[in-house]
């Protein structure tokens, strides 16, 4: 990937800022998400809650299923590959996917190395729990970062923890003297130029979304309050009682997160929320995959 292409991919991801990206498993769900105002959809055969419940090895979705969703909507379509699975990423690029998510939700294919995303033209999304993880993924070519959170739980606590951790570490890096950034980069295990960018600009060089456990308009507003530039919603919409209404409410809450009166109205009569899993009840911690 050329420097110009890398810059283009980062700019494409910037266009999603302030939006909501929704997990969908069928063309019908994709249309609901698009009608609700989603800025993109994530096409996958099973949403994270079902992946967690079923157990076993989870892999890239069937390309035919992904193509069906691509044909159903005009907004960008993302799809997931396993961490380190170069061949899955090549397949998704071959079917003209808009974004690839190298995702801890799926079973990792490589427990040491991530995909060299600089070898691809399609932009990549990657998860991170802290600043070091985020900058390492960006060094590998990621055009967009999201918190890992804990997918499929409906519990936002880990997404909150990861966003707070990342932003705290950014503030700490900004506060350093110029000659202290070298040591900080070494401790974070990241390239100096990326650490210097954060030090000088007070933010990541790519867009940073929240993901993992967002299930209500209030959850989305909370993540925006904490510095997210947009929100991924997985199981929280189509595992709820009224997906269309909840999807539209979360989109509006993300765009108007500072308007408490509107948030109160958006939170009314949404139907039953997804049945969640508390952090201390989780058996498999997906966020620990791919550091």
Curated annotation (Swiss-Prot):
One MF term in the entry's GO annotations: pyridoxal 5'-phosphate synthase (glutamine hydrolysing) activity
Binding-site positions, D-glyceraldehyde 3-phosphate: 164
Keywords recorded for this protein, A-Z: Lyase, Pyridoxal phosphate, Schiff base
EC number: 4.3.3.6
Reactions it catalyzes: aldehydo-D-ribose 5-phosphate + D-glyceraldehyde 3-phosphate + L-glutamine = pyridoxal 5'-phosphate + L-glutamate + phosphate + 3 H2O + H(+)
Highest taxon in the source lineage: Bacteria
Pathway info: Cofactor biosynthesis; pyridoxal 5'-phosphate biosynthesis
Keyword Lyase: yes
InterPro entries linked to this entry: Aldolase_TIM, PdxS/SNZ, PdxS/SNZ_N, RibuloseP-bd_barrel
Positions with a binding annotation for D-ribose 5-phosphate: 23, 152, 213, 234-235
Subunit: In the presence of PdxT, forms a dodecamer of heterodimers.
Family: Belongs to the PdxS/SNZ family.
Family annotation (PANTHER family): PYRIDOXAL 5'-PHOSPHATE SYNTHASE SUBUNIT SNZ1-RELATED
Protein name: Pyridoxal 5'-phosphate synthase subunit PdxS
Organism: Bifidobacterium longum (strain DJO10A)
Lineage: Bacteria, Bacillati, Actinomycetota, Actinomycetes, Bifidobacteriales
Gene: pdxS
């Amino acid at each position: 990937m050329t420097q110009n292409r890398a810059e283009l991919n980062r700019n494409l991801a910037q266009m999603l800022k302030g939006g909501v990206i929704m997990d969908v498993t069928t063309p019908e769900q994709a249309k609901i998400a698009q009608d609700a105002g989603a800025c993109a959809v994530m096409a996958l055969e099973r949403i994270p809650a079902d992946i967690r419940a079923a157990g076993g090895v989870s892999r890239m979705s069937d390309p035919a299923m992904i193509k069906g969703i691509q044909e159903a909507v005009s907004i960008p379509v993302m799809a997931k590959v396993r961490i380190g699975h170069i061949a899955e990423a090549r397949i998704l690029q071959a079917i003209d996917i808009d974004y690839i998510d190298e995702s801890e939700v799926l079973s990792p294919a490589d427990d040491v190395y991530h995909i060299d995303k600089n070898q691809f033209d399609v932009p990549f999304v990657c998860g991170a729990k802290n600043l070091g993880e985020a900058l390492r993924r960006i060094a590998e070519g990621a055009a967009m970062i999201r918190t890992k959170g804990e997918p499929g739980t409906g519990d936002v606590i880990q997404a909150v923890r990861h966003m707070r951790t990342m932003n705290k570490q950014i503030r700490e890096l900004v506060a350093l003297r110029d000659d202290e950034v070298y040591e900080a980069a070494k401790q974070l295990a990241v390239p100096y130029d990326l650490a210097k960018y954060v030090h000088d600009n007070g933010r990541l060089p790519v867009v940073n979304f929240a993901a993992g456990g967002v299930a209500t308009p209030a959850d989305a507003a909370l993540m925006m309050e904490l510095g997210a530039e947009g929100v991924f919603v997985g199981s929280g919409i189509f595992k709820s009682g009224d997906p269309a209404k909840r999807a539209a409410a979360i989109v509006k809450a993300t765009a108007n997160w500072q308007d408490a009166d509107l948030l109160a109205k958006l939170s009314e009569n949404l139907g039953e929320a997804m049945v969640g899993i508390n952090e201390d009840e989780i058996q498999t911690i997906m966020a620990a995959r791919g550091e």
